[in-house]
Amino acid sequence: MTFIITLLVHLYKFTNTLPNIDSIMNYYSNQNILASGRWALSLACGLSSYYDLPWIIGLFSCLFISLTAVVIVKLFKIDNPILITLIGALIGSSPATIETFFFQFTADGYMLSMLLAALAVYFSRIDENRNTFKFFSIMCICLSCGIYQAYVSFALILAVCYFIDILLNHEYSKQDCINWMIKQVIIYSVSLFLYYIIWKLMMYLTGITPNDYQGISKLGKMNLQLLYVGLKNSIKTFILFFLQNNILKGRINAYTIFNIIFIIMAVIIIIISIVQTKLYSRKWALILFGLCLISIIPFSSIWFFTTDSVSYRAMMLQSMTILYIYTVILYEKYAKINFKNLACVFFIAVVINNSLIANINYFYLNLCYENTYAESLEIVMRIHQLQDNQTFKNVAFFGDKRDDMQFTLKDTVTNKYIKAEKDFVYGRDIYRSLIDDSDSLSNFIEVNYGLKLVPAKKSVINDISKSRELEGMKCWPAKDSMKVIDGTLVIKFNNNY
C-alpha cells in the first residue's frame, strides 16, 4: 500500500520532465562525488542507471520507501492495517521526501540510504545480541552515511523512539536498557569511524581532496565553541522545520497550522502514555525517557556538531518524519478509541496536505521548465543570428537572476498577485528560470538544442566584469544585451554581478 500511495502522491513528478537548477547539470552523472564524502552514492544510484529517468527512479524510490515502512512496522510490532498504511503514507508524503524528488537524479540512492538506516536500528534491537546482527547494523549505518550523511539522523531518531517504546512497555530491566545504550554507542562509533576511514582511504587512492560543500572539509575538527553553535543551530532548525518561518514573518499557512496541532497532540499523548504505563514509578526509566526526548533535537541535525559550515534543509530532515510516525503509534497504544480515531483523521489530513504541497511544487517546477525552455530557445536564435557576422570562443553569463525570478501568480477573481512562497514550502528553490550561470546555460542549451557552448573561465569573466563595454550593455531581453567582447559571447541579464 505504501508503494501505491507514494506513487500516486508523486505521479506528476515521475511522469513529467520537471528539473530543478541542479537537475540540468545531471542529465547523466555517475554521482561519484567522493569529495563530498558520499563514497557509496555512485553505487546506490547506479541501480537505476546514471541517467535522470523520472519514472524508473521513482519506482525504485517507492520500493525503498515501502521497505523502510515494513522495517518500521516490524520494529514496533504493529499489526493494525490502518496504522501500517498511515506510516507508509507519512514517509511517502513527508517534506523531506518531497524535496528529495526535486533532486530526482539521486532520489533512489537517498531512499536506499533511508532503508539502510532503518535496517541498522532493526538489527540492533534490545532482544538481538548476535554478533552477526551487530555487524550488519554497523555496515548499514556505514553504507547509509556513505550514500548520504543526513540519514544517520534518521537511524538515531528511530533508535530513540524505539528505546522510548521499550521504556514504556516495562519489559526490560534497568541493566538491559543500559546494555542496549552501550551497544548503540559502540555500533555508531565504529560505523562512523569506519565510514571516515573508507572515505579517507578512497581519497588517498584517487588523489581527490575534500571540497567545501556543507563544510565537509572541516569534518572532525571539533571544539567547545562548535558544540555550543551546533546546539543553538539544531534548536533553531528543529523549530523552523515545523513553522517554516511563517509565524516568525507574520504569515501562517496550512502546513504550519497542522504542525502546531501536531506538537500539541504529541505533548498530550506523551503525558497520557507516562500516566497509563506508570513510568513515573520507575525513576531511572523516567530519567532515561526525559533524556530521550531532549536528545531528539541534537540528533535530528547531528552534523551541526561536526562542522560550522553545514546548512540544513528539508531533504536532510527525514528523521522528523519518525516523530509523526511514533506519535501515531502512541495514540494507537494508549489513547481511548475516540481519540485514536481523531488522531487517525488528523494524520490522514496531514498526508493529504503534504500531497497537495508536493503537487503545487511540481506545478511550479513545470512552469519553471517551460519558461527556461522558451527563454533558452530565444537565446539560441539570437546566437545563430549573431554567428552570421561574428565568431566567439566561449560564453559568459552576467547577472544574478534569482533576485527577480520568484514566481507570482494572479488570482483572476480578486486580481491580486500571490507569491509562490506563501503557497508551498520550498519557494526558495523554485525560480522562474533554471539558468543562473554560464555552466547551467551552456549545458541546458547543449542538451536540448545541440549547440555546444564553452563556459568562459573565471579569469575571463572577471576581466569582462570590469570592462566599460559590459557596463554600457542593456539587460536581457534588450537587443544589445548580447555581445561579443574579446572573443567571448556575453549575455547580460541584469546588473547584479
Kindly label every feature range from the protein language model:
Residues 131-135, 332-358:
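Signature aromatic-anchored transmembrane alpha helix within multi-pass, membrane-resident enzymes
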Residues 1-35, 39, 45-67, 76-88, ...:
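Intrinsically disordered, polar/acidic, low-complexity terminal segments
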Residues 243-285:
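Hydrophobic, aromatic-rich transmembrane alpha-helices
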Residues 133-149, 154, 160:
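Membrane-interface alpha helices of multi-pass inner-membrane proteins
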Residues 34, 38, 61, 82-125, ...:
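Membrane-interface micro-motifs in multi-pass membrane enzymes
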Residues 91-92, 279-305, 349-351:
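Transmembrane alpha-helix segments characteristic
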Residues 154-189:
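Perimembrane helix-loop-helix junctions
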Residues 117-133, 166-172:
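Membrane-interface transmembrane helices that cradle and orient dolichyl/undecaprenyl
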